[in-house]
């Protein structure tokens, strides 16, 4: 297996998604907060989007089954939540750090993986977005909340913007790791601005 820059960035994305899911479980008032349920929420948040992407692409076995390092990244993320719950919860609430970094990383990597499987650009952008958001959809559903992508804040749209930028820079033969960083950074910046300024897409009206 090639342990490239993007590979380690992907593991970092897995870890921050685990932290996002586990801290969401800890913060939820109606959640039981036992060790297994907190771990499972973090686990399903981390692997949900990538699993759906791999199934769609026919990439079997799915990534977390064939690469044990993904499971280790999940374990490390869960361990951080258990050992430093107040610290990671503060970061998550004040900086939107883990969700924001997670979707930035996973959108771009999902887009790249789809392209590597010979998928057209439009489908690659959608699969990149799905890679980033589907774990969060499952997390919010488990928490009995409206999934984040259906709320006012700009979320999935930021992922699509990052995917499109990645595709454009890839077409211009931008260096792969630089493309990853720039495209993921665009997603992070859009999310932070949207949250800071309370921006959202306009509602559709039914006449």
Spans of features found by a protein language model:
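Helix-coil boundary and interhelical linker segments in multi-pass alpha-helical membrane proteins
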Residues: 1-6, 55-65, 110-123, 168-179
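Structural signature of hydrophobic alpha-helical transmembrane segments
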Residues: 4-15, 62-76, 120-132
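The first (N-terminal) embedded transmembrane alpha-helix
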Residues: 7-21, 40-44, 162
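C-terminal ends of transmembrane helices
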Residues: 19-30, 54-55, 79-92, 137-147, ...
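Cytoplasmic-side transmembrane-helix entry/capping segments in multi-pass membrane proteins
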Residues: 35-41, 67-71, 92-103, 127, ...
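Small-residue-rich segments of transmembrane alpha-helices in multi-pass membrane proteins
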Residues: 39-48, 98-112, 154-167, 188
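Short, structured motif recognition centered on aromatic/hydrophobic residues
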Residues: 40-44, 51-57, 126, 130, ...
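Membrane-proximal helix-loop-helix units in multi-pass membrane proteins
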Residues: 89-148
């Amino acid at each position: 297996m090639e342990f490239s820059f993007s590979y380690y960035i992907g593991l970092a994305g897995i870890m921050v998604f685990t932290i996002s899911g586990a801290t969401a479980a800890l913060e939820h008032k109606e959640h039981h907060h036992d060790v297994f349920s907190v771990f499972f929420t973090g686990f399903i948040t981390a692997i949900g989007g990538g699993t759906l992407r791999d199934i769609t692409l026919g990439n079997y076995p799915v990534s977390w089954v064939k690469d044990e390092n993904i499971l280790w990244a999940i374990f490390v993320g869960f361990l951080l939540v258990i050992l430093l719950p107040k610290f990671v919860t503060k970061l998550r609430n004040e900086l939107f750090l883990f969700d924001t970094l997670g979707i930035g990383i996973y959108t771009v990597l999902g887009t790249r993986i789809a392209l590597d499987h010979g998928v057209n650009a439009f489908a690659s952008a959608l699969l990149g977005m799905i890679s980033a958001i589907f774990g969060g959809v499952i997390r919010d559903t488990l928490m009995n909340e409206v999934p984040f992508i259906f709320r006012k804040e700009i979320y999935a749209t930021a992922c699509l913007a990052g995917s499109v930028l990645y595709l454009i820079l890839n077409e211009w033969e931008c260096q792969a790791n630089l493309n990853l960083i720039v495209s993921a950074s665009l997603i992070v910046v859009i999310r932070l601005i949207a949250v800071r300024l309370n921006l959202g897409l306009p509602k559709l009206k039914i006449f």
